[in-house]
Amino acid sequence: MTSHALPLGTGARERALVQPAIDGLFLATILFVTFAKVHWQLAADLSLADVLTALFLVVFLWDRLERADARLTRTSVVALGFFAAFLLVYLVGFFNLDTEQALTQWTKGMIKFVLHFGFLVAGVTLLARRAERFYWYALAAFCGGIALNALYGVVQLILAELAGANLDAALIEPITSRETGIQVYGVVGGTEEVFRPNALTGDPNHLGIELVIPLLVLTPLYLRLERGHRLRTPLAVLLVFLLVVELATLSRSALLGLACGTFVLALPYRRHLRRPAFLVPFGAVVLLVGTVVAARWDFFLTVLRVRTNTSAAAASPHFGVYGFVPDVLSSNPLFGLGLNNFAVYYEFVTGRPDFGPHSFYVALLVESGIVGAALFAGFVIWLFRRLGAARRIGRALTVARDPLAARVRPLAWGFTAALVATLVANLFYLTMTFYYFYVFAALAVALPVVFGRRPRYG
């Protein structure tokens, strides 16, 4: 094993968990953040990750109070400023609520917001105080949780296809008392059901968009690993697996985002796309998918035609949702209809209690108006600026011939590509209100804090 193995950290003998209770809850929250089906209806719809977050925040704040330690990094202060600004927007939006249902939705949304953005602030603060190795553990927990979700989805799909069985009925429903299962997209030939795995996310599009993150974050890291590195083969296998599951979700939004994110990565890593390290795993995906498709050609051809239908009738619902914006802005232009009330308005307009075609950006404008949308744009710009700082650190490390450059720069590019992909995928879907995006944001903005604090230059 080379001396540059992941994690490439500050001291080989440092304790993995400095404060086991705080660090363990932090990593557990990240690991389970995409397990949306594991949730319970209490004061709000709380997932397992929400419960772990509440425990983490209580222990974290108690520790800080006990130590009389109020120190924050500059990044944490900025994150706290965004928290206060969003909170102010949502509190002003409270006065636009006009029904009991709207108030209930606002309350649920506020509980989620405080937990999730609170985790972002506390998470960045914690990562800034831990060794580089701990950051790698956090990244592994995040990507590992999504990978476990994908594995669950594969088992879910196999059982549905071969035995008509519902994996959720055996594993999830006894815990949550909620009836869930794989999505049945339709029927081909009157007899063959088309299944789309949703794993533990609750929706195949959610699974597909979340899978984009480890695919884009880990690919540049994998491509820069030294020959013979102990993680090179496991990462290649993992990326092949994740891409196959991505395709199985049949999510057009996810594939659109993945294509845009791949374009971002192709700019700095285009030379790697002609090398065996990329071509062999990609060829394995093509061979595996091609074999499965060839075995059921007529079935998959029918599904592909439906999923790539660009007729006006098929496309209009996805673009039609943007028609909500002028109507809402004409009545509540500055602060919208109130936090978490897009679902209420959607049902009012369409008559559908379950979401049809929708968009994060439409929901953003409907719920928080022009002010909220402008604030979120500022938040995204800040994320890009922090990732830009991480890339500059990577370049400086390269100039200084520091081996850590082979980790930091690819990671910064991977996060940048994943952020672009997520933004694009949410044009016609809605996942950026979910908890996983706050965890992603925490890892992204902490990147230059964690790897830019030690003197390495010159």
Predicted regions and their residues:
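A juxtamembrane structural motif centered on a specific transmembrane helix
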Residues: 1-23, 396-409, 426, 430, ...
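Transmembrane alpha-helices of multi-pass inner-membrane enzymes
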Residues: 27, 32, 54-60, 259-262, ...
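N-terminal hydrophobic segments of proteins, predominantly signal-anchor/transmembrane helices
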Residues: 20-40, 53-122, 291-292, 422
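Alpha-helical transmembrane segments of multi-pass inner-membrane proteins
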Residues: 118-122, 136-269, 381, 385-392, ...
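Loop-to-helix entry and N-terminal half of a specific, functionally important transmembrane alpha helix
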Residues: 25-31, 233-242, 388-428, 444
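Long extracytoplasmic/lumenal interhelical loops at the membrane interface
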Residues: 195, 299-368, 389-395
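A conserved mid-to-late transmembrane alpha helix and its immediate loop/hinge
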Residues: 199, 203-205, 243, 323-326, ...
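A membrane-periplasm/extracellular boundary helix in multi-pass inner-membrane enzymes
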Residues: 151, 157-163, 247-249, 266-310, ...
